[in-house]
Amino acid sequence: MATYSITTLVENCVYHRKLEAEHGLSLYVRTPEKRILFDTGQSDLLIRNAALLHIDLKTVDALVLSHGHSDHTGGLRAFLAENDRATVFCKRDIM
């Protein structure tokens, strides 16, 4: 049986002492074949939280941006500075 996981990198609340929260959302999805980032949160906080969770964002294969609000795309530049090879999926007007 294949194992899939979804890890919250950025959300309004935190349940781990060392992580930080902010308004926004970023989820790290791991499948047997792919690593997917769903949204990037409001800032570069996803980079810090990913490091604390031992998630290497350089291994992300694809980034999915749900919509163009800043609390879902604000960390885009920070993510692309870490990973310039991931395929980005979004509506044309987001970029």
Predicted feature locations:
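Basic/polar N-terminal segments that are highly enriched at the extreme N-terminus
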Residues: M1-T3
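Conserved beta-strand hairpin/beta-sheet module of binuclear metal-dependent hydrolase folds
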Residues: S5-L53
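Active-site metal-binding motif and surrounding structural segment of the metallo-beta-lactamase
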Residues: L45-C90
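Metallo-beta-lactamase
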Residues: I94-M95
